[in-house]
Amino acid sequence: MTITHQQRRRLAMALLVLTIAVTVSRLRAQNIAPSASAALSSSVVANTDQTSTQQPGADIPPQPGPKQLTNFVEAGGDYLNLSNRFGRWVGGYGRGTVTTGNNIWNGEVNGQHEFGDAGVYMGAGDTYTFNSDWYGSLTVGSSVGGFFWPRFRTDGFINKKWMSRKQLITTFGLGYYAAKDAHRDHSFFLGSTYYFAKPWIVEEGIRFNVSNPGSVFSPAAFVAVTHGRNKQNYVTVRTGFGKEAFQLIGPTVSLSDFQSQTLSVTWRQWIGTDWGVNFVGDYYHSPFYQRGGTTLGFFREF
């Protein structure tokens, strides 16, 4: 039986809604009280961005920070316009985390319509604290539909805290990305995060990526600055820049070997003691098109 494009879109969106509902109900069943000392790092703020995380490029996927907003669910949607007749991107997402012992479990479902196709990405991971100085994380993900989503991706990171207040964190990571065509990417990441005594966090990192076929070297870097306090608000400004080995714009069509830049501003605002809104403004530039838009989500802590 042949499935039409419209039927694929409906199936993808139905799967997204169903998965979000199941995730929320399971998190409610956990009935885990939020930690009074939980704080939000720039990594977690940046992780709310919806800026083209489906393909490796100048926007490096953020890593879990040492102090995260935990035991929460969030759901929202995004709308972005593209220049040069590339259309628009529209989608919705659901994500959440639960803490059990030394583990912080996280899950994500993201349904998008891009470049005339639709699909749903699903990912899960764990951040594990080994001791007061070391913690690591591992995430895996795959997708249904959507040529622009990865067939499979995984990222692993190990982090070390330094100095008297443990205010400096260094990060080392490895990643693997399998697109739905022949492209396969292997990456190596180095980064650091510094927590100032006042409510400022500075994060930077660089990813060295090799894409095959062709062994195309495509390094990319980012810098992020966060200001704010837990249970009040956080504002993060994040910029990324570097080289993209490829970007799929169709099942058999790709842009290749070009420079791109990204800029995002994230505002996470608590409205009540355990809930609030998350707003993201995104901008992307490449020689082929520009992209700009917003993401709006609502979160609830447990």
Task: Please report, for each region that a protein language model flagged, where it lies by residue.
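Outer-membrane beta-barrel initiation region
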Residues: 32-38, 43-123, 127-129, 151, ...
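Repeated loop/turn-to-beta-strand initiation elements of outer-membrane beta-barrel proteins
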Residues: 71, 101-107, 132-138, 164-171, ...
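Transmembrane beta-barrel strands of outer-membrane/channel proteins
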Residues: 73-79, 107-111, 124-126, 138-142, ...
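Solvent-exposed loop/turn segments connecting transmembrane beta-strands
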Residues: 80-90, 111-120, 142-153, 177-186, ...
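Residue-level signature of outer-membrane beta-barrel architecture
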Residues: 96-100, 128, 160-162, 194, ...
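Outer membrane beta-barrel transmembrane domains
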Residues: 144-146, 224-226, 230-276
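Detector for outer-membrane/organellar transmembrane beta-barrel domains
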Residues: 160-246
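Outer-membrane beta-barrel "beta-signal"
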Residues: 225, 291-302
